Every structure is written in C-alpha cells, then in structure tokens.
Regions:
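Active-site helix of classical SDR
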Residues: 30, 72, 80
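Active-site-adjacent segment of SDR/Rossmann-fold oxidoreductases
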Residues: 41, 61, 77, 82-92, ...
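C-terminal helical subdomain
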Residues: 96, 116-205
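Substrate-binding pocket helix/loop in short-chain dehydrogenase/reductase
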Residues: 6-7, 14-16
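The catalytic Tyr-X3-Lys active-site helix of short-chain dehydrogenase/reductase
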Residues: 59-62, 67-75
C-alpha cells in the first residue's frame, strides 16, 4: 500500500498503516519460518531455506513524499541484512529485491507508457528472473544483499559504509571546519536512479 504525503501533512494513521503492512508484514511470517528452520537444524535435518524480501528504491535511495513508505522499505533492507546474519547458521539465506516496474500500485505515480516498447520496458517480467534465481539452489552462497531490478538494470544496492572520518571532537564550536573537510571527501548521496550525486537536495561539498 501507499499513503503518500509530505511529512508535514502526514497523519499518524497514514504512518502506522504503511509501517504495519510493509515492515511488520515482513517480520511476521519470517519469524515463524526462522523458528521452523532453527528447529529443523537442531534436529539434525538438512535445511536449505530462502527468504526473499521486497524493498524499494524509495527506501534505499529516498523519494519525496514517501517518508512512511521509504522508512518501511529501508527497514526491510536492514531487516534483510540482520536476518541473514542470524539465519545463516541454520542454512538459510536472506536477500531482498527492490523492484522498479509498472504495476497497479505504481501506474498512477507518473506518466503512462506511450508505446508498447515502453510498456514492455517497464514490465514486471524483469523482476521475476532474479527472484527465481535467489529461490534456487544456485544462490546458496548469496545472502544479506539487496538487488535492484528493472527493465533498465540489475544491480546490487550497496548499503551504508563508513565514509570520511575525524578524531572525536569534544567542543561543538570546533566542528564546523572538521565537518566541512569530511563533506569535501564524502560521496554525494544517490538519487532514485542509484547514481552518486543525483540526490535532488543540494549537497555541500
């Protein structure tokens, strides 16, 4: 579901509904599957489990008007990483896919495809192959990853990494030039296309 609204206009109900459906909706079945696989493993039975979650470029890159949806989908990406660390010992992989496609949920978010070729390019069919592969035995060594999939690209969305650093600073009045120096070395945020420096908000370098 979507309940798009600018943050200043968003109601608590709109926030709760989206978080509940997407983030809690990911947690709820996963915990039962995790407990089952854990018990199977402890009983000495072979386990070759897969969890494939659905994240979004709105969550991993950010999109205006979707603080609720983006937060839920970013939470799913983090959930995927942490669950992969917990469940790997039982023989379970946990990955996520951030799909970009024309669906009933997204068809009113932008201009409709003008040609059959454009509609084909935005088809959900480009999402299915990576989901199928992640569910297969071939993907056994891949876990804790978020894959972006669309008619434009198949990519691995790389998570947070530590960027430029400084020694700890006790006096906040001295932070200005230190942060400015770190910002000059930092990568610019990616926009919805996943490329560095395409984030719409101006970023100081």
């Amino acid at each position: 579901i979507l309940r798009d609204r600018m943050l200043a206009n968003m109601s608590e109900e709109e926030w709760d509904a989206v978080i509940k459906v997407h983030l809690k909706g990911t947690f709820a079945p996963s915990r039962f599957a995790a407990a089952y696989w854990r018990d199977q493993n402890k009983a000495g039975k072979p386990v070759d489990g897969r969890i494939i979650n659905t994240s979004s470029v709105s969550g991993i890159y950010g999109n205006v008007g979707q603080t609720n949806y983006g937060a839920a989908k970013a939470g799913i990406a983090a959930f995927t990483t942490i669950a992969s660390l917990e469940l790997g010992r039982y023989g379970v992989t946990v990955n996520a896919v951030a799909p970009v496609a024309l669906t009933r949920m997204t068809e009113n978010l932008g201009p409709a495809p003008e040609t059959e070729a454009e509609r084909e390019h935005r088809s959900p069919k480009w999402i299915a192959p990576i989901v199928t592969w992640l569910a297969s035995s071939e993907s056994a060594g891949i876990t804790g990853r978020v894959f972006e999939a669309s008619g434009d690209v198949l990519a691995i969305a790389e998570g947070w990494h530590r960027g430029p650093t400084s020694k700890p600073v006790e006096d906040p009045t001295k932070l200005g030039p230190i942060v400015e120096e770190m910002m000059a070395k930092a990568r610019l945020n990616a926009g919805m296309d996943g490329r560095d420096g395409t984030w719409p908000q101006p970023q100081k370098k």
